[in-house]
Amino acid sequence: FLSAYGQKNTELKLDEAGNFHTEMPVSHPSVAYLSVGGSVISFLLSPGGETKITVNLREMTRASSRLRKDAKPEGKKVYFEGLNAGLNTEMNSGLEIPLCSVELKDLYDMNPDQYKAYCMQKYEEADKAIYANKKISKAYAELLTVLNKDALYGLLCGYDYQLLQAYAQQKGLSVRDASKEYRSPE
């Protein structure tokens, strides 16, 4: 499956050689995701650009295999050509860069203003970690800061659901049952 952020998944049809071709119009630089088996490959698309992706299925399955994961790697899992090739390669290098996120256990009994302050703190911590990371390029750091802002936006827009989930988790209830009794603290 292939999907650009915020768009519907597109199922890809492979030819007999295992190749596919598709076009995905974007009006601005957008992160897209290619799902192959249980793995997800993220990459940047730009208007008017072309991106070629070669997936090394042999390596991808070796790396996720319990029996063969310690065997010698057989190349990279994915190769990129075309516009943003270097940045896309860096995005899939395996380096973990955490973005703004919350822990439900921390949210219990927070009111919306406390939640906003908590999210802003998590956002600032992630932003500092991105810029302090000397293993990534300036272009990748800039992309990550945009994605970090997007993560913050999603958390702030969904504050009511996040607080409800935290309440449900703390009380051992389903979200549906929790929604019947939950009231945001003032």
What feature does the model see in each segment?
Residues 141-186:
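Extended amphipathic alpha-helical segments with heptad-repeat/coiled-coil character used for oligomerization
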